[in-house]
Curated annotation (Swiss-Prot):
Keywords: DNA-binding, Homeobox, Nucleus, Transcription, Transcription regulation
Tissue specificity statement from the Swiss-Prot or TrEMBL entry: Expressed predominantly in flowers, and in the cortex of the root and the stem.
Pfam families cross-referenced by the UniProt entry: HALZ (PF02183), Homeodomain (PF00046)
The species this protein was found in: Arabidopsis thaliana (Mouse-ear cress)
Any one GO CC term of the record: nucleus
Ranges where the record places region Disordered: 77-109
Compositional bias segments (type: Polar residues): 82-95
Subcellular location: Nucleus
DNA-binding region: 112-171
This protein's encoding gene: HAT7
The family this protein is said to belong to: Belongs to the HD-ZIP homeobox family. Class I subfamily.
Principal subcellular localisation of the protein: nucleus
Function recorded in the entry: Probable transcription factor.
Protein name: Homeobox-leucine zipper protein HAT7
Annotated spans, Leucine-zipper: 172-207
Length: 314
C-alpha cells in the first residue's frame, strides 16, 4: 500500500514538471523568433544568462515575466521607429503639447521634478510695455521679443495669453464697479423720487378732503341763503298784497274823501300856477300894459273858476 502511494506521487510530480516546462519553455526557444526580427537590436540568445533549474519550480514565473516585459518594450520601440512620417509628425505635435503643458504660468519651462523658472524683473517689464502697446501678439513681434529677451517664442505666447486673461478679468471688475456705482446712484434717485411722490400723494389726498369739506360748506351756506331769500320775497309779496288790499278797501269805504284829496292836490297845483302868473303880471305892470291885457288879467278868476269846475266834472 505504501509503495502504491509513492508511485502515484512520483507520477503526479512528473506530470507537474511537464506542465511547468510547457508553461515556461527554455529561453533559447522562447526568444528565437524575437532574435530573428530584431537581430540588430537584441543580443544573441547565447549571451543571455541561463535560467537556473530551481526557478522553474517555485519562483521562476516572475523572473521570466519581467524578462518578457523588458524585451516586449524593446520590440515596441522597434515598431514605433518604423512607423510612417505622418504618425511621427503627430507624435511630435503631441510632444510639443506636452512640453507646453509643462510650462508655468509665466512662460518658464518646467521639466519633470524641476522647479519653476520665473522671468526676471527686466523681462517682465519689457513684456508689460509690449502688452500695453497691443494685447494681441503677432508672430513677428513674438519672435522679436523672444530674441530681445532671450526667451523661447512659446514662453512669450503663453505669457501674453495669461496676461490677456488677467487683463480681461480686471476689465470685467472695473466694468462691474462702474455699473454698480451707477446702479447705486440710480437707486438712490429712485428712492428719493418715490419718497417725494408719496409725500405729494399725501398732500393731494389732504387737499381733496379739504376741497370736499369746503364744497359741502359752500353748498350748505348757499342753501341757507336760498331759504332766507325765498322767505323775504314771500314776505314782501305778502306786504305788497296787503297794502293794495288796504287801499282798495279805503277807496270802497271813503270815495268822497279820495276825491277831496284829489281836488286838494289839484288846487295846490293851481295855486302854484297863480303865484307864477301874478309874478308875471306885476312885471308887466311896469311895461305899459294895455286895457285888454288888464281886462284879461282881471278876468282870470272866472276862467280859473271854469277850469276848476271842469276838473271836478272829470
Amino acid at each position: 500500500m505504501y509503495m502504491y502511494e509513492e508511485e502515484r506521487n512520483n507520477i503526479n510530480n512528473n506530470q507537474e514538471g511537464l506542465r511547468l516546462e510547457m508553461a515556461f519553455p527554455q529561453h533559447g526557444f522562447m526568444f528565437q523568433q524575437l532574435h530573428e526580427d530584431n537581430a540588430h537590436h537584441l543580443p544573441s540568445p547565447t549571451s543571455l544568462p541561463s535560467c537556473p533549474p530551481h526557478l522553474f519550480y517555485g519562483g521562476g514565473g516572475n523572473y521570466m515575466m519581467n524578462r518578457s516585459m523588458s524585451f516586449t518594450g524593446v520590440s515596441d520601440h522597434h515598431h514605433l521607429t518604423q512607423k510612417s512620417p505622418t504618425t511621427t509628425n503627430n507624435m511630435n505635435d503631441q510632444d510639443q503639447v506636452g512640453e507646453e503643458d509643462n510650462l508655468s504660468d509665466d512662460g518658464s519651462h518646467m521639466m519633470l521634478g524641476e522647479k519653476k523658472k520665473r522671468l526676471n524683473l527686466e523681462q517682465v517689464r519689457a513684456l508689460e510695455k509690449s502688452f500695453e502697446l497691443g494685447n494681441k501678439l503677432e508672430p513677428e513681434r513674438k519672435m522679436q521679443l523672444a530674441k530681445a529677451l532671450g526667451l523661447q517664442p512659446r514662453q512669450i505666447a503663453i505669457w501674453f495669453q495669461n496676461r490677456r486673461a488677467r487683463w480681461k478679468t480686471k476689465q470685467l471688475e472695473r466694468d462691474y464697479d462702474s455699473l454698480k456705482k451707477q446702479f447705486d446712484v440710480l437707486k438712490s434717485d429712485n428712492d428719493s423720487l418715490l419718497a417725494h411722490n408719496k409725500k405729494l400723494h399725501a398732500e393731494l389726498v389732504a387737499l381733496k378732503k379739504h376741497d370736499r369739506k369746503e364744497s359741502a360748506k359752500i353748498k350748505r351756506e348757499f342753501a341757507e341763503a336760498s331759504w332766507s331769500n325765498n322767505g323775504s320775497t314771500e314776505n314782501n309779496h305778502n306786504n305788497n298784497s296787503s297794502d293794495a288790499n288796504h287801499v282798495s278797501m279805503i277807496k270802497d269805504l271813503f270815495p268822497s274823501s279820495i276825491r277831496s284829496a284829489t281836488a286838494t292836490t289839484t288846487s295846490t297845483h293851481i295855486d302854484h300856477q297863480i303865484v307864477q302868473d301874478q309874478d308875471q303880471g306885476f312885471c308887466n305892470m311896469f311895461n305899459g300894459i294895455d286895457e285888454t291885457t288888464s281886462a284879461s288879467y282881471w278876468a282870470w278868476p272866472d276862467q280859473q273858476q271854469q277850469h276848476h269846475n271842469h276838473h271836478q266834472f272829470n
